[in-house]
Curated annotation (Swiss-Prot):
Coiled coil: none annotated. Keywords: Amino-acid biosynthesis, Aromatic amino acid biosynthesis, Decarboxylase, Lyase, Tryptophan biosynthesis. It catalyses: 1-(2-carboxyphenylamino)-1-deoxy-D-ribulose 5-phosphate + H(+) = (1S,2R)-1-C-(indol-3-yl)glycerol 3-phosphate + CO2 + H2O. One of its GO terms (molecular function) is indole-3-glycerol-phosphate synthase activity. GO terms for biological process: L-tryptophan biosynthetic process. Its EC number is 4.1.1.48. This is Indole-3-glycerol phosphate synthase. It comes from Listeria monocytogenes serovar 1/2a (strain ATCC BAA-679 / EGD-e). Pathway: Amino-acid biosynthesis; L-tryptophan biosynthesis; L-tryptophan from chorismate: step 4/5.
Length: 252
């Protein structure tokens, strides 16, 4: 079994036990898509709260998610990403709920979403953006969840890893497209994935490069074609995350 297959098998079990929540009032913040369109002079940062990962194991188990998120916000991050997967990433929906209560910027629910139950739960916890990973879904399921998320007034970050997936994301009209430099089957990371796919951008979407960024030089590699980068592990390992986040700022 690959990492992705193992995660999805566990996710089916998790979602089967998950209650279907009533839709509650949505948390108020700005549209991340509109924010990116209005702030094109600088590469924007999606800063992530991540305790652990399948490939790296424990990264920062003792983190206070609220203090970490506040540090990111103070550093000028445009959005906070919160891992909510409990088994492989040691996150929780409570992490997201607490972060969303304590920051004013958009919060992304970072999880392997396979059900509308997860979309409603994320919205109720304060997320205004959700992640849909093309390699984790059939195209039919992707479209269903994409439409359900939009109906819930959520923004959707559609994640791709190759040209075929990018074509699907552009075809369905995704406004936020994330290119994951990490292969979810092997968990190997290569920023060259984002460099390669940039030549196939053909929509008015905002493009985000995800994974593998440690320095401003890394960010500069994708700064001409991408609007933002998503950074997790590099920030989670730093004693001063605000300083680390500021160090990744790159002018376009």
């Amino acid at each position: 079994m690959t990492f992705l297959e193992e995660i999805l098998a566990q996710k089916e079990v998790e979602v089967a036990k998950m209650p279907l929540e009533q839709v509650a009032e949505k948390r108020k913040t700005y549209s991340f898509y509109e924010f990116l369109k209005a702030n094109t002079n600088t590469m924007q940062l999606i800063a992530e709260v991540k305790r652990a990962s399948p490939s790296k194991g424990e990264i920062n188990m003792g983190v206070n998610p609220v203090l970490q998120a506040k540090s990111y916000q103070a550093a000028g991050a445009g959005m906070i990403s919160v891992l909510t997967d409990p088994v492989f990433f040691k996150g929780s929906i409570e992490d997201l709920r607490e972060v969303a209560k304590n920051v004013g910027i958009p919060v992304l629910c970072k999880d392997f979403i396979i059900s509308e139950k997860q979309l409603i739960r994320a919205r109720n916890a304060g997320a205004t953006v959700v992640l849909l990973i093309i390699s984790a879904l059939t195209e039919e399921k992707l479209i269903t969840l994409f439409e359900q998320a939009l109906a819930l007034d959520l923004e959707v970050l559609v994640e791709v890893h190759d040209q075929e997936e990018l074509a699907v994301a552009q075809k369905i009209g995704a406004q936020l497209i994330g290119v994951n430099n990490r292969n979810l089957h092997t968990f190997e990371v290569d920023i060259a994935v984002s460099e390669r796919l940039a030549s196939d951008f053909s929509s008015d979407a905002c493009f985000i490069s995800e994974s593998g960024f440690r320095t401003a030089e890394d960010v500069a590699r994708v700064s001409q074609k991408y609007d933002a980068v998503l950074v997790g592990e590099a920030l989670m390992r730093e004693a001063t995350p605000e300083v680390a986040a500021k160090s990744l700022k790159v002018t376009r």
